[in-house]
């Protein structure tokens, strides 16, 4: 049972929409939060925002991102070669990091209106009156948005609060038409959680085999409009994103290395994806992180500052809007080094907000204490408390899917899969879990195809290699995103089955995969027959003839093998047999056996 106690408010007022300072990316269709029909705003006048900067924008701001990254990486390498940035000494300093993660929930409805939360629709096509803060409109909490948020909190071992409330966080910016964001500052729906990071998660060596990171709280909040800046200093706003449901996950400052911080964000993303709580990961913009960084001298004992109940810390700075795992790690490294350099020079660290640019070597100041915003948090008078029943929590706990740690152990230890540690980790992290689902489908189909071969199935590792490396290589080469329909699981299973039965060679299997990947609609069996890919083994006499020919052409190498014992050169002869013979019919193992027999026998 989930219910919300609604507060009373006067009747709706009728006002004309006056959108000041914004230009809608497209005319939008209003979708009311009340059942009063759909109104078309497509004829509404467009209003533009023209903000002039004090200084002209340089052309470098419009350089393609790929080129910028290449240039920045090149400059970074050059600086290292010149020795202009000697590495800081960190042994005498303790780094402390806390992380705030914002994740888009996977829901059909927005948080406070019945408008669709679809991601890729036409700009400004899913907008309710409340989303654009039309005077008189009220928020209407959608209980369905709480379900993925609860799954996320339970997966991170949080205590679910039976009663939670919403607050207003006041600030003025173009992407927030109401002048405030609705969040859960004082009474969040989940508190006191934790996650466990292990060695395979990529934690720092000094953290040993594992480290536990506390979760202070998880709170629900509404997203803001999507803003696009044009070269003319005009901003286009897409209000589709307003009131999409987010959760903010706040960790305790218990992280002491950049690598472990990145591993923490990576692990939280994997947890959210495993329980179906989020739309996409960091790669697609569905998750972003802010990090709080402080350092203190180990020899001087505890610092003077406190953060989320943890005392004895140094003065912290916050780095906003990090959008990749690498950005999290690199930004923390840069800020750690900056703070150490300032303190060693006799300076002090200011409690400020800083930014980070991908490929940069240092953080940049955004605003200091004097520029900090007073958000004037206050309870939202239009929203009553959210009451969560025990029945809902119990039902979600019973239906909880496997979490990343359990998935990892299953992929590594289950005889059905037997993946390496690296492959298991990669499989879990890729493509929001879709690659893992595809892999499991291929394995299940292959088991069905090979019931006649052996009671002990051992093809899981081979399937992992094909899914991650062969198919993954084709995706990388073609710069295409993951799509399980491009090579159906049935087709890949049939290719691997033919290869394991030695009915086709490895090169033929790769050719088959490439043809299916490129859109060949024929069945795998039909392609094999049409393209004459079925393996026909050479006879012993044919192997001997080929071996004798390559030996006759290379007598010096034969002598080196016989007289000097350079057996490694036999592999070169195998390659020559494949070159002069039919590569699709040559089995390397048989070719090597014949070569050893002919070369070494004559030497005995």
UniProtKB/Swiss-Prot annotation:
EC number: 6.3.5.-
Stretches the record annotates as Disordered: 28-57
Biased composition (Polar residues): 33-46
Gene Ontology cellular component annotations, sorted alphabetically: glutamyl-tRNA(Gln) amidotransferase complex; mitochondrion
Catalytic reaction list: L-glutamyl-tRNA(Gln) + L-glutamine + ATP + H2O = L-glutaminyl-tRNA(Gln) + L-glutamate + ADP + phosphate + H(+)
PROSITE patterns (alphabetical): GATB
Gene Ontology MF annotations: ATP binding; glutaminyl-tRNA synthase (glutamine-hydrolyzing) activity
InterPro entries referenced in this protein's UniProt entry, alphabetically: Asn/Gln-tRNA_amidoTrfase_suB/E (IPR017959), Asn/Gln-tRNA_Trfase_suB/E_cat (IPR006075), Asn/Gln_amidotransferase (IPR018027), Asn/Gln_tRNA_amidoTrase-B-like (IPR003789), GatB (IPR004413), GatB_Yqey_C_2 (IPR023168), Gln-tRNA_amidoTrfase_suB_CS (IPR017958), Gln_synth/guanido_kin_cat_dom (IPR014746)
A Gene Ontology biological process term: glutaminyl-tRNAGln biosynthesis via transamidation
Top class in the EC scheme: ligase
Keywords assigned: ATP-binding, Ligase, Mitochondrion, Nucleotide-binding, Protein biosynthesis, Transit peptide
UniProt-annotated location(s): Mitochondrion
Boundaries of the annotated transit peptide in chain numbering: 1-48
Stored Pfam families: GatB_N, GatB_Yqey
Alphabetical list of HAMAP family matching this protein: GatB
Task of the protein: Allows the formation of correctly charged Gln-tRNA(Gln) through the transamidation of misacylated Glu-tRNA(Gln) in the mitochondria. The reaction takes place in the presence of glutamine and ATP through an activated gamma-phospho-Glu-tRNA(Gln).
Subunit and partners: Subunit of the heterotrimeric GatCAB amidotransferase (AdT) complex, composed of A, B and C subunits.
Family the UniProt entry places it in: Belongs to the GatB/GatE family. GatB subfamily.
Protein name, as recorded: Glutamyl-tRNA(Gln) amidotransferase subunit B, mitochondrial
Species, as recorded: Blastomyces gilchristii (strain SLH14081)
Taxonomic path: Eukaryota, Fungi, Dikarya, Ascomycota, Pezizomycotina
């Amino acid at each position: 049972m989930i219910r919300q106690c609604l507060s009373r408010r006067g009747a709706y007022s009728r006002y004309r929409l006056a959108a000041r300072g914004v230009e809608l990316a497209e005319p939008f269709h209003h979708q009311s939060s009340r059942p009063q029909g759909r109104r078309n705003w497509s004829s509404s006048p467009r209003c533009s925002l023209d903000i002039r900067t004090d200084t002209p924008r340089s052309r470098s701001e419009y350089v393609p991102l790929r080129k910028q990254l290449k240039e920045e990486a090149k400059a970074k390498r050059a600086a290292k070669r010149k020795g202009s940035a000697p590495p800081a000494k960190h042994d005498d300093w303790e780094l402390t990091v806390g992380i705030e993660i914002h994740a888009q929930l996977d829901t059909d409805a927005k948080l406070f209106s019945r408008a669709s939360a679809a991601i890729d629709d036409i700009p400004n096509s899913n907008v309710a009156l409340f989303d654009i803060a039309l005077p008189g409109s009220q928020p209407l909490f959608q209980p369905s948005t709480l379900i993925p948020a609860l799954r996320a909190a339970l997966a991170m071992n949080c205590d679910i609060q039976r009663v939670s409330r919403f607050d207003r966080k006041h600030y003025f910016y173009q992407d927030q038409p109401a002048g405030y964001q609705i969040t859960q500052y004082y009474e969040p729906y989940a508190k006191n959680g934790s996650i466990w990071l292990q060695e395979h998660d990529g934690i720092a060596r000094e953290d040993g085999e594992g480290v536990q990171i506390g979760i202070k709280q998880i709170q629900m909040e509404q997203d803001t409009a999507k803003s696009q800046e044009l070269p003319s200093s005009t901003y286009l706003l897409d209000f589709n994103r307003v009131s999409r449901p987010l959760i903010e996950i706040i960790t305790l400052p218990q992280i002491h290395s950049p690598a472990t911080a990145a591993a923490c964000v990576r692990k939280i993303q994997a947890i959210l994806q495993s329980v179906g709580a989020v739309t996409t990961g960091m790669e697609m913009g569905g998750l972003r992180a802010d990090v709080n960084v402080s350092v203190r001298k180990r020899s001087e004992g505890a610092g003077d500052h406190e953060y989320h109940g943890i005392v004895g810390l140094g003065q912290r700075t916050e780095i906003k809007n990090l959008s990749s795992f690498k950005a999290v790690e690199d930004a923390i490294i840069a800020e750690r080094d900056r703070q150490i350099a300032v303190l060693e020079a006799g300076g002090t660290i200011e409690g400020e907000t800083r930014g980070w640019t991908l490929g940069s070597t240092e953080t940049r100041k955004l605003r200091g204490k004097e520029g900090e915003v007073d958000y004037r948090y206050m309870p939202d008078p239009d929203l009553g408390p959210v009451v969560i029943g025990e029945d809902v929590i119990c039902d979600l706990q019973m239906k909880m899917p496997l979490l990343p740690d359990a998935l990892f152990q299953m992929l590594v230890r289950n005889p059905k899969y037997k993946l390496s540690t690296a492959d298991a980790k990669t499989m879990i992290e890729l493509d929001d879990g879709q690659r893992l689902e595809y892999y499991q489908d291929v394995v299940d189909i292959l088991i069905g195809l090979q019931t006649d071969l052996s009671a002990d199935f051992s093809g899981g590792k081979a399937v992992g290699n094909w899914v991650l490396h062969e198919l993954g290589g084709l995706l990388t080469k073609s710069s295409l995103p993951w799509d399980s329909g491009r090579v159906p699981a049935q087709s890949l299973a049939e290719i691997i089955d033919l290869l394991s039965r030695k009915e086709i060679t490895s090169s033929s299997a790769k050719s088959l995969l490439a043809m299916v990947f490129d859109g060949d609609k024929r069945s795998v069996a039909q392609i094999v027959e049409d393209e004459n890919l079925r393996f026909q083994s050479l006879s012993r006499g044919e192997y001997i003839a080929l071996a004798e020919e390559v030996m006759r052409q290379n007598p010096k190498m034969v002598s080196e093998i016989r007289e000097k014992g350079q057996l490694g050169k036999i592999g070169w002869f195998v390659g020559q047999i494949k070159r002069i013979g039919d590569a699709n019919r040559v089995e390397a193992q048989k070719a090597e056996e014949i070569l050893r027999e002919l070369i070494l026998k004559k030497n005995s």
